[in-house]
Amino acid sequence: MAEKAEAASASWRLENWFPNLSSDVQSKFKKYNALLQKHNRALNLVSSKTLPLMDIIHFSDSILAIQILFDDNPKIDHLYDFGSGSGFPGIIAAVLYPKVKITLVEMDPKKCEFLKGCADELNLTNVSVMNTTIESMQLDSVKFAVTRGFANISKSMLITRKCVASKGVLYHMKNEQWGLEVGQIPTQLCSVWTPALVKEYKLPIGEVRFALLKTEKN
């Protein structure tokens, strides 16, 4: 276990990639990584293969996407993270934007306890956790939400169609295959939602292009 912790620490490069982030933010990200490493075996929070590369695969991806999201709409004051699981990108958003209320929605009670523990350990007073299914959420209760590794765009729109209010926006973090998902959206869904690319981006290392998309409910 000590060797794994040392390996994780050795591959931590966020300070080099994001030098503009404050020392407090960097410290919270490092502590969050330690919590993920500690509890992953029991809770299956992320793929074990990604543990040595958490900084690039999970943290950098979430940081870049969340920054793009708030650049797209700086007036967001409450953001839901649907299917939060390990807390990406919701915990990242909470650390970067402490004045924004972040609600993590997760159906697995054990993962909810982990998320609550993370919020406490990182002193994130802007975070709340909902142990529920998205389908069970109150009608038209959500104005802004984000998903990562949740479902394809079409399925995400179907699952969230009741809880997202009119003019509400659902953001989708996607890999380079995002165009295929957009092309597969049924015509009927496009009468309810309007899809759009917000921005493509690349991680600090590698050439793969990722994307943040949004679907606005009509």
Could you say what each language-model-derived stretch is?
Residues 36, 174, 215:
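Residue-level signal for inorganic ion chemistry
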Residues 101, 126-128, 169, 192-197:
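Conserved beta-strand segments of alpha/beta enzyme cores
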Residues 40, 119, 164, 185-189:
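Conserved hydrophobic residues forming the short capping helix/wall of the S-adenosyl-L-methionine
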Residues 52, 63-147, 157:
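Conserved SAM/SAH cofactor-binding pocket of Class I
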Residues 167-179:
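Conserved beta-strand signature within the Rossmann-like core of class I S-adenosyl-L-methionine
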Residues 177-218:
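Active-site capping/gating segments
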Residues 1-76, 80, 110-127:
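Class I SAM-dependent transferase core
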Residues 157-169:
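A short glycine-rich, Lys/Arg-flanked "PGG" loop and its adjoining helix->strand segment in the class I
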